[in-house]
Amino acid sequence: MEFLPEPQHPPGPPTMDLEEPKGPEVPSEDHPSNTQWALGPRGPDTLSEMELDTSSVRALVQQLEALPSDLGGQFPDGAPCPLHIATGQGLATQENLDAGGLLSAEAGGDNLLGLLRCEASLPAQSVPPDPAQAAPRLLQPPEDPGGDPGWMEGTEPADNRSSSSSPELWLETAPLVTHRDPPVGTQSQETLASCPAVSEVPGPCGQEELMDGVLFGAKYLGSTQLLSERNPPPSTRMGQAQEAMDRVKAPEGETQPMTEVDIFISTKRVKVLAADSQDALMDHALQTISYIADIGPVLVLMARRRLAKRTTSQDRQRQLYKMLCHVFHSEDAQLIAQAIGQAFSIAYSQFLQENRIDPSQVGMQPSASASHPHNGDLDHFCNSQNCREVCIQKRPGEGLGVALVESGWGSLLPTAVIANLLHGGPAERCGALSIGDRVTAINGTSLVGLSLAACQAAVREVRRHSSVTLSIIHCPPVTTAVIHRPHVREQLGFCVENGIICSLLRGSAAERGGVRVGHRIIEVNGQSVVAMPHARIIQLLTETREIHIKTMPAATYRLLTGQEQPVYL
C-alpha cells in the first residue's frame, strides 16, 4: 500500500471550530459531513500543531483496515446503515441527537442491543432491495426535511402504523406467528371426554342424516289456525289435529286441491319446501313443533306461536297460544311423524351432552313411556286428595239412594261404581258423592274384588243403620285410555261391538292403556262416536298408532241416557 506524501498545510488555520467537544463526538450543524476528525488518542489544540509523520499515517491506515468492510461504502440507492444512523454519520445534519455517545462508557445498553439486532438483520449490499416488498419501518426517521428521502422507501405515515408491538428498538416488523384465541364454541378433548356420549336413538333415519337434514315427499293440502293452551293433554292435542284435518281436507267426493312439496326435517328446523324450486314455504324451529299426528295417509303438523300479551286477568292466566296446523297427504305419513319424533330425541340427547348432564339423572330412559303408560284411573288413584271417607246420616230403614254398577273387567281397582243418585236421597243430601266415584269399603268392610251382587247386598245390610261411612275414590264418570302402538299393523287387543268393548286380550296395549270390558266408547281421538256407525268407529281405531279413547261403563251410559231405569239401594 503506497503512502501519500505529507500534506502541505497553509500557514493559517482553517476557519472551523476545533474545540474538543465535552460530550460525544457529534458533527456540528454548521459543518458538512466530510469534516476531518481527530483520530489520535489526544487531539491537538490547534491544527498547526498536528503533524502527520510516517508513523501516524501507518497507525491511521491500520485503524482504517481494522474497520468492518461493510462500512466502507455509502448506500445512495438503498436504506442507510443503521450504525451510521446511530452515530450521526453518513446522513444529513440532525437537530436532536442522543446525549450519550453510543460507544462511550455511559452509553445505554438498550441502544447497543438494538444496534446489534439491526446489524444482524441487514440485507446484503450486492442485492438491492425490492421496492415491491415491504421494507422494515424505522421508528426514528431523520427530522431534516431536506434530506434524501430515498432511505424512507417502504415506510408509511405514523397514522397508518400497526398497533402490534415489536421487541426491536429500531425496527418494527410484522410478527411471523399470530397467536389466536380458540373459538368460543370449541372444547378441549378433556371436556369432551367428560361429557356422556350421545346414545343411538331408534327411528327410521340415521342420526347423522337427521343432523344434516332429510327430505320427505308429500302433498300440501292447506293450513289453519287454532287457539290452544301451552300444554294441553294428549287427548286434546289429538282432537285439535282431527279438527284441523276436517277443516282443510275436502269432503269425500269433492276435488282436493294439493301442492307437491318436500318436508325437510333436521335436529334444528322443520321446513316445507316447494318441490320444483326448493324455496322455503314454511320454516319452523324444531322446539316450536307442538304435536304431530298421522291419521291414515294424512299428516298434521302443529307449530306453536305465542299471542300478544293480554290485558284481562282471565286471558293472562290461560296464556293462549296460536297453533299453526299444516295438513299434508303422504303414503309415508307415519314415517314422517316418526322422523320428527326421532329428531326431537336426538336434539335432546345433544343438549344433555353439551351441558354435561347424565341422562340417568333426568330419567331419560328409552322405554319410559312403555313401562309407565298413561292410565286415567291410575292418575286418580295416585292422588291422595281423591281418597275420602264420607259419612251419610239417614233414618233407620232408609236406603242410601245410590245405583251401583261394576267397574268392568280389566279395571285397576275392581269394585262398585256409583252410576246414579236418587234425587233428595241421603247420598245426594250429603253432597260428597258424585257419579263415577269408586266405593272401596262400607262401614269398614272392603268391597274390592267382590262381584256386583255382593256389593249390592252389603249396601242393603246397612239400611237399618242411622249412620253409614263409605270409603270412596273420587273419579269422573268418563275415563281416558291411551293406546300406544309401534306401528298401525300391530293389533289393538280388544273387540268392539256397537260401540261397546266386549273382549280384551290379556297383556295387550289396550289393557296397559286402561281399556276395560263392558265400557261404552264415547270419544276416539277427540271425536264423538256416540251416533257413529260401527264401520267408522273401527276405521278411527285402526288408522293411527296412538289412540286416545274416552269410555264409561255401559250400564252408566244407559242409565244417564234413559235407556234403563236405575235400581236405588
Swiss-Prot record:
Cystine crosslinks: none
Segments of skewed composition (Basic and acidic residues): 19-32
Biological process according to GO: chemical synaptic transmission; in utero embryonic development; protein transport; regulation of gene expression
One GO MF term attached to the UniProt entry: amyloid-beta binding
In-chain residues carrying the UniProt-annotated modification N-acetylmethionine: M1
Annotated tissue distribution: Ubiquitous.
Low complexity: compositionally biased ranges: 132-141
Residues bearing the modification Phosphoserine: S166, S367
Region (Disordered): 1-53, 124-168
CDD domains named among the record's database cross-references: PDZ1_APBA1_3-like, PDZ2_APBA1_3-like, PTB_X11
Annotated localization: Cytoplasm, Perinuclear region
Role, per record: May modulate processing of the amyloid-beta precursor protein (APP) and hence formation of APP-beta. May enhance the activity of HIF1A in macrophages by inhibiting the activity of HIF1AN.
Complexes and interactors: Binds to the cytoplasmic domain of amyloid protein (APP). Interacts with HIF1AN (via N-terminus). Interacts with NECAB3; seems to mediate the interaction between NECAB3 and HIF1AN.
Protein name in the entry: Amyloid-beta A4 precursor protein-binding family A member 3
